[in-house]
């Protein structure tokens, strides 16, 4: 399931940057 959460977290971090 982590594989589905990592991309979401990466997207949030990229959005904040």
From Swiss-Prot:
BP terms from Gene Ontology: defense response to bacterium; innate immune response
KW Nucleus (keyword) present: no
Tissue: Expressed by the skin glands.
Modified residues (Leucine amide): 17
Record's keyword terms, sorted: Amidation, Amphibian defense peptide, Antibiotic, Antimicrobial, Immunity, Innate immunity, Membrane, Secreted, Target cell membrane, Target membrane
Record keyword Membrane present: yes
GO cellular component: extracellular region; membrane; other organism cell membrane
Domain of life of the native organism: Eukaryota
Subcellular location: Secreted; Target cell membrane
Function according to Swiss-Prot or TrEMBL: Shows more potent growth inhibitory activity against the Gram-positive bacteria S.aureus (MIC=50 uM) than against the Gram-negative bacteria E.coli (MIC=150 uM). Has a weak hemolytic activity against human erythrocytes (LC(50)=135 uM).
Similarity comment text for this entry: Belongs to the frog skin active peptide (FSAP) family. Alyteserin-2 subfamily.
Name of the protein in question: Alyteserin-2b
Record lineage: Eukaryota, Metazoa, Chordata, Craniata, Vertebrata
